[in-house]
Amino acid sequence: MRRGKRPRWMLKIAEERIDILFRMADREFSANPHRSHRYTELARNIAMKYRVRIPREWRRRFCRKCYSFLKPGANCTVRIADGKVNFRCHECGHIMRFPYIREKKDRRRNKIESHTTKEGTDEQITVGAHNKCGESQSDR
Amino acid sequence: MITPRNIFRHELIGLSVRIARSVHRDIQGISGRVVDETRNTLRIEMDDGREITVPKGIAVFHFRTPQGELVEIDGRALVARPEERIKKKFRKP
């Protein structure tokens, strides 16, 4: 085992606890926001102690600077600008920027791939037609 | 999954709890929901909406898991920081 690495079952409990805490934070936010900020802090402590990544669905739900829980529409605004998603925390005014260049690239790649596969299928059809119809297709 | 076997390592916040026995008589029999945890205390929101801070070390707690099982735990097994409890070794007192 690597130095400082925890056994698998501990990491599993840590992951479960992080998920429970964030869900509690989400539920408590409307009634007691200070509790949800506290739960975020506890979840982050667990994540740091056991070097577990905070799941993707919760990573954008707390402020990177003041670590308060964020609920879009209540204490945070989400805007898209310059190829980034901007989360503005209303507790401290910090702006978190998440670029979505990877998704953009994927979309571009899919576009190109869909073109090429379409041409490929076209070719296959012509090849099949060529086999059937003889030389009339290949002359073109 | 919170089971009776790993409950003292798992998240206590959100569970419903009853104080079964305590050195301090006034807090004995209190029931409610855990809303916060520190190294030495649990903060319990009682059924009438009041919050009370209870030291872990002096009481025996009855927790109810989300599956509905009742678990009795000596508070002395819980005395540790919330994030440290996962790796805490449990000794029968």
UniProtKB/Swiss-Prot annotation, chain A:
Main location: cytoplasm
Any GO BP annotation: tRNA 5'-leader removal
Keyword Ion transport set for record: no
Basic and acidic residues compositional bias, start-end: 111-121
InterPro entries to which the protein is assigned, alphabetical: RNP4, Rpr2/Snm1/Rpp21
Entry's cofactor comment: Binds 1 zinc ion per subunit.
Binding site for Zn(2+): C63, C66, C89, C92
Pfam families: Rpr2
Localization per Swiss-Prot or TrEMBL: Cytoplasm
UniProt KW keywords: Cytoplasm, Endonuclease, Hydrolase, Metal-binding, Nuclease, tRNA processing, Zinc
E.C. code: 3.1.26.5
Cofactors demanded by this protein: Zn(2+)
GO cellular component, one term: cytoplasm
Keyword Nuclease carried by entry: yes
Induction entry: Constitutively expressed (at protein level).
Record-level Gene Ontology MF annotations: ribonuclease P activity; zinc ion binding
Chain spans, region Disordered: 107-140
Known role: Part of ribonuclease P, a protein complex that generates mature tRNA molecules by cleaving their 5'-ends.
Stated name of the protein: Ribonuclease P protein component 4
UniProt lineage: Archaea, Methanobacteriati, Methanobacteriota, Methanomada group, Methanobacteria
Encoding gene, per UniProt annotation: rnp4
Swiss-Prot record, chain B:
Subcellular compartments: Cytoplasm
Main localization category: cytoplasm
Record's GO cellular component terms: cytoplasm; ribonuclease P complex
Description of what induces expression: Constitutively expressed (at protein level).
GO biological process, one term: tRNA 5'-leader removal
SUPFAM superfamilies: Rof/RNase P subunit-like
Example of a GO MF term: ribonuclease P activity
Keywords: Cytoplasm, Endonuclease, Hydrolase, Nuclease, tRNA processing
Alphabetized InterPro entries for the sequence: RNase_P/MRP_Rpp29_sf, RNP1, Rof/RNase_P-like, Rpp29/RNP1
Any Pfam family matching the protein: RNase_P-MRP_p29
Keyword Hydrolase: yes
Reaction equation(s) it catalyzes: Endonucleolytic cleavage of RNA, removing 5'-extranucleotides from tRNA precursor
The keyword Cytoplasm is assigned to this record: yes
EC code: 3.1.26.5
Function noted in UniProt: Part of ribonuclease P, a protein complex that generates mature tRNA molecules by cleaving their 5'-ends.
Sequence similarity: Belongs to the eukaryotic/archaeal RNase P protein component 1 family.
Oligomer status and interactors: Consists of a catalytic RNA component and at least 4-5 protein subunits.
Name of the protein: Ribonuclease P protein component 1
Organism: Methanothermobacter thermautotrophicus (strain ATCC 29096 / DSM 1053 / JCM 10044 / NBRC 100330 / Delta H)
Gene: rnp1
